[in-house]
Structures are given as structure tokens and as C-alpha cells.
Amino acid sequence: NSKSLLDGSLDTRVYTDNANVSRVNVSDYVNPGKYEINIKTAATKATDTATDVGINSTGTGAIGASGTISINGSSVDIDANDTMSEVYEKIRAAAEVGEAEMKTDDGTFTGLQASRYGSSAALVITFSGKEGVSTTKDFATALGYTTDLTTDAKTGTMTYDAAKAGNSGTDAEVELSVGKVIAGTTDTSIFSNTATVATDGNRVTITDRDGFSMSFL
């Protein structure tokens, strides 16, 4: 609501009993009444589902290969003398800058997932081994990536093929009850037949009638 709270002029209040809805924004043109919005499918993140990926976060042994790994555009250099735990921390830090996050299991690095939800979520991982120290394949293998990699013939850079070993992010799917009795009540939804829904990740925006808008995530 765009009206000031200080002078007590707020006339539109929105309540939710769903702890997973963190914020609801409504325009000044929303009419008081019953609204029913059903989340059919929750938004998801892009995820790395490769097998045989695991760097022990407390390992003291040297990784044995050097190169550069890029996670969603955030690059970090890894030295052959870095311990597994040091490599783990470097990858974790790069992932955070690259809008990704570690997926851990029993203290080991088991993969990455995008920080954002929805179809715009990205998870692009590339490996580039340093010449004379290790091949790019050796470097990627040392980091635990042994499958589902494609190589650029010109640069030798290997890209994690998310299409083969990952799940793309998806937007939420919602359903509006238009002119129907809401379950368990005698009230009907006051959405009109022209109500439309737009989703962007886990953000849902509903427009209906002139000036009406409702957005939540």
C-alpha cells in the first residue's frame, strides 16, 4: 500500500496465515473481500545433480591440480598445493558472489544450486586448467567433476553441462478462483474474469481491473 502509515490513513490490510509467504504488496485499488490463490507448483532453483562430486570440507590433502573455476561468472584461482578444505572454502566463496550456494552432505561438497528461484536462475560452471600443471580435464576431475562436461575446442575450457546433469529452475504456478465459492466458506472470490497472473521465480503478481495489483512471494 502506498499510503502513509504515520497519519493513520492506511486503509488496506493484507493478512496471511502461510508462514512461507514472506511479503504481500497490494495497490490502493484492491477491494476488501475474500481472495483465493492456490500455489499449484512452487518455484524451484537451478541445481547441480552430477554424480561423483565430493570435496571433503575438512580434508588436509593437496588437491594436486591448479586452474580456475568460474561459477555464474565469479572466478577463483585454485593452486595445486591448496588443501581440499581450502578449495572447498574458495568454491563456497565464489558461489556466494556468483549467486549460487553450496549443497552439503555430511561435511562434503556435493554440488551447487542457484540462489534465485525460477526460470531465470542460472548455474553455469566452467573449469580451466593451467597449462603445464594439469589438463583441464585433470583439473575438473580433481575438483570432483568427472562427468557431463563439454570442452570448447578453441580455449580448452570445460563447461559443466547443466542440461545433462542438472535441473533448470522453474517459476511458480498459481491458480485463481474466479467467481467460485471458496472451500469451507460461503464466500466467493472477487477476482474478475479478466484477472491475470505473472510469475517470476517465487514472486507472483496479479492484476485485475483498473489500478488493481497484488504481489507476493
Where are the language model's segments positioned?
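Bacterial flagellar/type III secretion structural subunits and associated motility module proteins
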Residues: 3-217
